[in-house]
């Protein structure tokens, strides 16, 4: 009996394994049939939509080139308008259907997949003329913002200077402010040792100036001249660039509190001048010097123009210093507006106030920005040249603007100082309250205990 059961179980297992193998074979045979059916349907659909000629049999008598030629003729006559219409829709290319051609064909032949390679080449040929721009979507690249360029300190002589005509006799006058002060005595000896000649024919009331002559000038129309002001400015008239660099190098040894080199070359003034017949004047940003004057009178007129240029470059340096100071306290109003705590000590606030007072003292008390120098009181012609140049350089307006900025900065620093004083007073009051509380507690302890 057990042997019979074992044989029945083995036979049933063999039957089940055979059935499973038959099922797998049937599934594998159906898969190629489905793929063949899908390929046939897709081929018929594309063939109907494109209206292409495909051979039914390989032995139809047509070779590869003839089939390509027939399909090309069909595409030329029937594919042009639908493709053009398709390209105009949403910037995307769509395959034209039979409805777009306005015709309905009935397929009467069976598909032949032997020409599939020819069919792929025909598709490539028909769509080779379609622009690739219709398939690639437009990309919106973000615009990169360029960093804004730092604004130059206001120089009216540069911004309002008209375009000058080209003139071979045109010469240049350049002014620099390099330090707070010069040692004119030592500078005179040092320049004389380098071959420069000092001009000693100046009036007695022009004591704070040094005038040096240059042998080789930039142009032959006027001798090269350099004016050194004790206030720390130098003005070059008709001097070569090479000579100018040499003088600036010698000047570094005799400077008191020199400025930054980049700031010196950035904040400068340059005017063109020319020799004419007639009275000297400043016309449309160009200095016109009288060619009939002798050397001493020509030096005095150049001194009047140079004095105004000296004030302009010194004021430009102080404008840059004030702008730097404003940037250092720019975060204070923003912090007060946002209700944040301002991290400034009492010593730092007093230092800021000292910087403001020093700058204000230089502009209003230690310079000739507010009044005309005494040198021009009995020289009306030179005073006219000086005032005209100062007006062209907008010195009065710039000084007024600087004083307004200084006043605003003073109000801000006073606010910070009062705020710190109030904090200190409040701290002292709390200390007094705490001490009184401790004393009261001691008294209460002595009474009750």
UniProtKB/Swiss-Prot annotation:
Name the InterPro entries on file: DUF155, RMD1/Sad1-interacting
Q: Which UniProt keywords are present, listed alphabetically? A: Disease variant, Mitochondrion, Primary mitochondrial disease, Protein biosynthesis, Transit peptide
Disulfide bond residue pairs: none
Location in the cell reads: Mitochondrion
Q: Which GO terms describe its cellular component?
A: mitochondrion
Q: Where is the transit peptide?
A: 1-12
Query: Where's it mainly located?
Result: mitochondrion
Keyword Protein biosynthesis attached? yes
Q: What does the record list as GO biological process?
A: positive regulation of mitochondrial translation; translation
Q: Does the keyword Electron transport apply?
A: no
Function according to Swiss-Prot or TrEMBL: Required for mitochondrial translation, possibly by coordinating the assembly or maintenance of the mitochondrial ribosome.
Its family remark reads: Belongs to the RMD1/sif2 family.
What disease is associated with this protein? Combined oxidative phosphorylation deficiency 11: A severe, multisystemic, autosomal recessive, disorder characterized by deficiencies of multiple mitochondrial respiratory enzymes leading to neonatal hypotonia and lactic acidosis. Affected individuals may have respiratory insufficiency, foot deformities, or seizures.
Assembly and partners are described as: Homooligomer.
Record protein name field: Required for meiotic nuclear division protein 1 homolog
Source species of the chain: Homo sapiens (Human)
* Gene name, Swiss-Prot/TrEMBL: RMND1
């Amino acid at each position: 009996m057990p042997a019979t059961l074992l044989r029945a179980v083995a036979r049933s297992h063999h039957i089940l394994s055979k059935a499973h193998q038959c099922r797998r074979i049937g599934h594998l045979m159906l898969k190629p049939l489905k793929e063949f059916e899908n390929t046939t349907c897709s081929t018929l659909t594309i063939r109907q939509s494109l209206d292409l000629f495909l051979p039914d049999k390989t032995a139809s008598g047509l070779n590869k080139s003839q089939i390509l030629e027939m399909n090309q003729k069909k595409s030329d006559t029937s594919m042009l308008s639908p493709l053009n219409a398709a390209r105009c829709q949403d910037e995307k290319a769509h395959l034209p259907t039979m409805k777009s051609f306005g015709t309905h064909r009935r397929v009467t032949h069976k598909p032949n997949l032997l020409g599939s390679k020819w069919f792929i080449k025909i598709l490539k040929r028909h769509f080779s003329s379609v622009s690739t721009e219709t398939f690639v979507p437009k990309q919106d690249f973000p615009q990169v913002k360029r960093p804004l360029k730092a604004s130059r300190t206001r120089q009216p002589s540069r911004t309002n200077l008209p375009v000058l005509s080209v003139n071979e006799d045109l010469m240049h006058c350049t002014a620099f402010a390099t330090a707070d002060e010069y040692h004119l005595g030592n500078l005179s000896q040092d320049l004389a040792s380098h071959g420069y000649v000092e001009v000693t024919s100046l009036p007695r009331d022009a004591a704070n100036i040094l005038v040096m002559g240059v042998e080789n000038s930039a142009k032959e129309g006027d001798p090269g001249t350099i004016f050194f002001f004790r206030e720390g400015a130098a003005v070059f008239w008709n001097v070569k660039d090479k000579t100018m660099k040499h003088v600036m190098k010698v000047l570094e040894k005799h400077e008191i509190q020199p400025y930054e080199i980049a700031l010196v070359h950035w904040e400068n003034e340059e005017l063109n001048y020319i020799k004419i017949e007639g009275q000297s004047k400043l016309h449309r940003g160009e200095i016109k010097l009288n060619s009939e004057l002798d050397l001493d009178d020509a030096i005095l007129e150049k001194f009047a123009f140079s004095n105004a240029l000296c004030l302009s470059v010194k004021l430009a340096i102080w404008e840059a210093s004030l702008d730097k100071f404003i940037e250092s306290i720019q975060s204070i109003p923003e912090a007060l507006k946002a209700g944040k705590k301002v991290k400034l000590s009492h010593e730092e606030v007093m230092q800021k106030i000292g910087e403001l007072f020093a700058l204000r003292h230089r502009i209003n008390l230690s310079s000739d920005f507010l009044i005309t120098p005494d040198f021009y009181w009995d020289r009306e012609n030179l005073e006219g040249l000086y005032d005209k140049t100062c007006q062209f350089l907008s010195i009065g307006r710039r000084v007024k603007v600087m004083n307004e900025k200084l006043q605003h900065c003073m109000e801000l620093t006073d606010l910070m100082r009062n705020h710190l004083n109030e904090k200190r007073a409040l701290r002292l009051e709390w200390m007094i309250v705490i001490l009184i509380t401790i004393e009261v507690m001691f008294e209460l302890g002595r009474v009750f205990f």
